[in-house]
């Protein structure tokens, strides 16, 4: 069982990461070469951990980076929330000890608040801020009804003004994340992406669904390809990148400079290193069930070390334990936990149960 006394996130990764096939020390994006153009850095380091609200906290980002992600994004951060000084909002952009750097995603509708937020985030993070991304893709009604997120795709002039406001304020690159369009059947992504690039966006991430689809149906990678053909800035492909092979296929089939992995990383931080192996012409090693349990334990220790709410571990259990024997039982056990010690007790029991099951199989074959 992992120690519950480790306090530093960097110490947790150094102690537990290598044992589960993860890096014990995290490197900065593109080796920290901030002086190089973003296009070059993305081309050489194309595997990105997507921003996900309620998911990509510091512990999750560190697991993804340890699993091979070249760069990880914050959860989407409200410009208004930063303006009004909510400490909970500011916590979303904080970088934990051992986390080398961060891409911060902002959302809102007011250019002046975007300029202020970008400047404040840049001051707070300093050299650890890689880029500012503007969310123009979130399909959630409580966001779009305010004209934010994917609703901005119906107000391109306003969207362009947000890009210009940020680009005119900070020295780091400003990028955008968009969808195929807001409403089913109304594809605007290629032209919209051109307008954002003209306004100063140095890269465009494209999710191949309409906002009205949410995450239903299939992402259309053809629209990603059309955006690649429409703009002169790097395009980052997103949508239905569920495993390492799909990450490699996105790059090969669409011509994108980089690929953004979201739900495919659930319980699978190795997706990035596996994709890198495929891109290098090598077959990735499979991940054993025991290694997944150990990685869940590592992730829980990172949650504790970064001061995150440990109830997030209940979702993590669903993801890491998916497909295991009696997974529903073990998920139920995890759902009863609220402290690190309780979670680690469950993983210890699970590990013993797996060892006993293996021993029984071996005895049956003797």
Language-model features: locations:
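Alpha/beta catalytic cores of nucleotide-metabolism and tRNA/nucleoside-modifying enzymes
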Residues: 1-43, 47-48, 53, 59, ...
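N-terminal small/glycine-rich loop or linker at the start of catalytic domains
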Residues: 36-48, 83-101, 138-148, 167-175, ...
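Alpha/beta enzyme core
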Residues: 115-148, 155-233
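Glycine-rich, positively charged N-terminal anion/phosphate-binding segment
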Residues: 20-41, 52-127
């Amino acid at each position: 069982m992992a120690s519950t006394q480790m306090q530093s996130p960097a110490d947790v990764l150094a102690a537990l990461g290598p044992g589960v096939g993860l890096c014990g020390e995290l490197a900065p994006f593109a080796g920290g070469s901030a002086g190089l153009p973003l296009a070059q850095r993305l081309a050489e380091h194309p595997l990105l951990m997507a921003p996900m609200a309620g998911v990509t906290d510091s512990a999750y980002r560190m697991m993804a980076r340890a699993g091979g992600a070249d760069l990880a994004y914050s959860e989407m951060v409200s410009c208004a929330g930063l303006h009004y000084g909510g400490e909970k909002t500011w916590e979303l952009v904080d970088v934990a000890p051992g986390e080398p750097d961060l891409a911060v995603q902002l959302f809102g509708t007011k250019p002046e608040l975007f300029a202020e937020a970008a400047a404040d985030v840049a001051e707070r993070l300093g050299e650890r801020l890689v880029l500012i991304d503007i969310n123009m893709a979130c399909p959630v009604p409580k966001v779009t009804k305010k004209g934010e997120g994917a609703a901005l795709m119906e107000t391109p002039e306003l969207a362009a003004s947000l890009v210009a406001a940020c680009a005119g304020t900070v020295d780091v690159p400003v990028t955008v994340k968009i969808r195929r369009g807001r409403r089913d059947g109304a594809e605007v992504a290629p032209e919209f992406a051109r307008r954002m690039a003209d306004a100063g966006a140095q890269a465009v991430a494209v999710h191949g669904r309409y906002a009205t689809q949410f995450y239903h149906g299939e992402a259309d990678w053809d629209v990603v390809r059309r955006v690649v053909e429409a703009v002169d800035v790097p395009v980052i492909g997103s949508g239905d990148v569920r495993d390492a092979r799909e990450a490699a296929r996105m790059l090969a089939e669409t011509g994108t400079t980089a690929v953004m992995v979201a739900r495919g990383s659930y319980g699978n931080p190795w997706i990035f290193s596996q994709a890198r192996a495929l891109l290098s012409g090598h077959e990735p090693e499979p991940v054993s069930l025991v290694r997944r349990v150990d990685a869940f334990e590592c992730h829980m220790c990172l949650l504790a070390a970064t001061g995150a709410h440990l109830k997030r571990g209940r979702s993590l259990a669903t993801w890491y334990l998916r497909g295991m024997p009696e997974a529903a039982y073990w998920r139920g056990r995890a759902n009863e936990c609220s402290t690190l010690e309780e979670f680690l007790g469950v993983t210890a029991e699970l590990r013993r149960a797996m060892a006993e099951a293996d021993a029984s199989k071996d005895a049956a074959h003797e």
